[in-house]
UniProtKB/Swiss-Prot annotation:
Superkingdom, natural source: Bacteria
The protein's name: DNA repair protein RecO
Gene, per the UniProt record: recO
Homology family: Belongs to the RecO family.
GO terms under cellular component: bacterial nucleoid
Stored Gene3D superfamilies: Nucleic acid-binding proteins, Recombination protein O, C-terminal domain
Pfam families tied to this protein: RecO_C, RecO_N
Organism (species): Variovorax paradoxus (strain S110)
SUPFAM superfamilies per record: Nucleic acid-binding proteins (SSF50249)
């Protein structure tokens, strides 16, 4: 019998966890080199377990695991430190990012650049960037959404009209729609200028795309930020197959209290 595949010292984040037995958990984990995987953490619910205080969402971990089945076995987990747990709306935003990954990433499909972007957005949400404000956190979410859509092949080129491949005109208005990609906007549609879309394409192609895209979005005015958010939300909901993501609905419910 072939030896079970073992992975050591793998950078990872817990996306979701649920009960497997009275004492164990199933984890959905995003790893840097192996993508999204499922792990069983045996005994993790016991008070004496070393896993218990470590296996938390939105925290940088280093994991050891093994096995060839669809659900591998967790052998070791270490918290890598660096930031505290996000709180309040930032925590819900972190859960929102996790929900996107669970819905859009296939198992065992590595996305190293996306992993690095995820680490970046978690740091912003945790306030690692001095004086991180709501606007910075919102820009980080938009940057991550764009990078996620591109990584999974759902974002068209942002410097041409999708169906005609005609270059964008800088002062014309274009909208991003699920069925047709980027096209000229009709009156009243959420849209950005051709110059804005071209700038976004440029920063997405940067060697450090998350940071470059965050900075670009942070320079946009409130109207452009709102238009970008609405277009990306519609595109993500379409590809996730839902009208509203669970975490988005949770945010709305809390804001209505």
């Amino acid at each position: 019998m072939a030896a079970a595949h073992r992975v050591s010292h793998e950078p990872a984040y817990v996306l979701h966890r649920y009960d497997w037995s009275e004492s164990s958990l199933i984890l959905e984990v995003f790893t840097r080199h192996h993508g999204r995987i499922a792990l069983v953490a045996k005994g993790a619910k016991r008070p004496s377990s070393n896993f218990r205080p470590v296996l938390l969402p939105l925290q940088p971990l280093q994991l050891n695991y093994g096995g060839d089945a669809e659900i591998r076995t967790l052998k070791g987990a270490e918290w890598m430190g660096g930031h505290v747990m996000p709180t309040g709306e930032a925590l819900l935003s972190g859960y929102y990012v996790n929900e996107l990954l669970l819905r859009l990433l296939a198992r065992d499909d590595a996305h190293e650049a996306l992993f690095d972007a995820y680490a970046g957005v978690v740091q912003v949400l945790a306030g690692d960037h001095a004086g991180a404000q709501a606007a910075t956190q919102a820009a980080a979410l938009r940057a991550f959404e764009l990078l996620l859509l591109r990584e999974v092949g759902l974002l068209p080129s942002l410097d041409v009209q999708t169906l005609t491949l005609e270059p964008l005109v800088a002062d014309a208005r274009y909208t991003l729609v699920p069925e047709a990609g980027l096209r000229l906007a009709a009156e009243g549609e959420a849209a950005l200028s051709g110059a804005d879309w071209q700038s976004l394409q440029g920063v997405l192609d940067d060697r450090a795309p998350f940071t470059a895209t965050l900075r670009e979005i942070a320079t946009m005015n409130a109207g452009s930020n709102s238009a970008l958010r609405n277009q990306l939300r519609a595109l993500l909901n379409y590809h996730c197959g839902v009208s509203t993501l669970r975490t988005r609905q949770m945010m709305r419910d809390l804001q209505a209290l």
